[in-house]
């Protein structure tokens, strides 16, 4: 702002020099600032082109000029700038020296300058850096900032040192006494004991009397047999033998021969005589005979009887539907029919128990204690059920698992149809059961088996394992229409 005011003052001085071109030896003019107590002349309006927003008050206060000391021809230029009403206050004497304070002063030079905006000057050089200001007072502490987002998860810390060993816990409550174990099998015969120690040496006999040479005596009788030696101590227990190799699976048994034809059943009782049938309908009339040859003309006879009825005419059109007749009365109950022949329903069922615990793996389990097997379809020797009647069957098992895990599979048509397992160790006891419906054809076989190291099926005085199956309905009855 100060630079702009100085530039306007320089332009004003140059304009005044052009007006007074006749005086070649014009001294430098001097300006004095008007006192601040004087008001701005009425009608004096500064150019709006030099004002900025917020600076109008400053320009208004500095618009008044200093009082002249003497009159001069230069008054014309001052009057043309300030207006007609400014002549009473502002008068500039010719060639008088005055001073001008440009601080807060803006000169309106609209009448002496061109209205065309001048070109923008080049930016000035950057001034030197000013001295460092004094350190300001410490500001009041700011408000606490908002909580920042959660930082990334830190790296896993190093493993801590091992803690001290804790005190020994109190002893647990003694458990219930276990069930008595089964009697073990007879062990193998022990090795032959070592020879017992020799007996003590007998006392020395008395010296015999010296005699002459005698003849050789005969051979004496054999001495009595000595006493048996002491029984040797039992030998050390031999090492446990290794597990035998897996046996080969047996071939399927041959199909049994067809059974003999059963004896003919007893003849049924003769049925009662039926009721007399209703009277039959009348038969249709016969066709007329062929016409005979014409005979000789006879005498005129008497009027004969009417001739035969001619043949029936063609069938007429279908008549309209008649009205429905009334409902007839309920007929009387018929006579009871004769007793029919009884049909034999095919049957097949079995139920068997396991007699030894922990059956061998990967082979049919032999449930050899038969409870029911009238048709003989289940074989306790092979542990397999042989289907003789095709149809839909129901199979079930309920087994006890103890001491080791068990994996049970139900096999039908040489394929595992169902698999289940029980995980037990120690002396734990549990039960497993199954109910399954299967459709079988004649000759199909069904059995149960366990896997290696998963054969924990158990039987005992208080525990049983059972396998059962029966025919639900044969295939023939299922295919018949009602």
Curated annotation (Swiss-Prot):
Gene3D superfamilies: 2.60.120.40
Coiled coil recorded as keyword: no
Chief localization: secreted
Keyword Repeat applies: yes
Domain C1q: 343-478
Expressing tissues: Expressed in the organic matrix of otoconia (at protein level). Expressed in neonatal sensory epithelium of vestibular utricle and saccule and also in otoconia.
Signal peptide, first to last residue: 1-23
Comp. bias regions, Low complexity: 137-153
Collagen-like domain sequence ranges: 130-189, 217-276, 283-342
Superkingdom, taxonomy of origin: Eukaryota
Function summary: Collagen-like protein specifically expressed in the inner ear, which provides an organic scaffold for otoconia, a calcium carbonate structure in the saccule and utricle of the ear. Acts as a scaffold for biomineralization: sequesters calcium and forms interconnecting fibrils between otoconia that are incorporated into the calcium crystal structure. Together with OC90, modulates calcite crystal morphology and growth kinetics.
Domain characteristics, as noted in the entry: The C1q domain mediates calcium-binding.
Similarity comment: family membership: Belongs to the OTOL1 family.
Protein name: Otolin-1
Organism: Mus musculus
Gene transcribed to yield this protein: Otol1
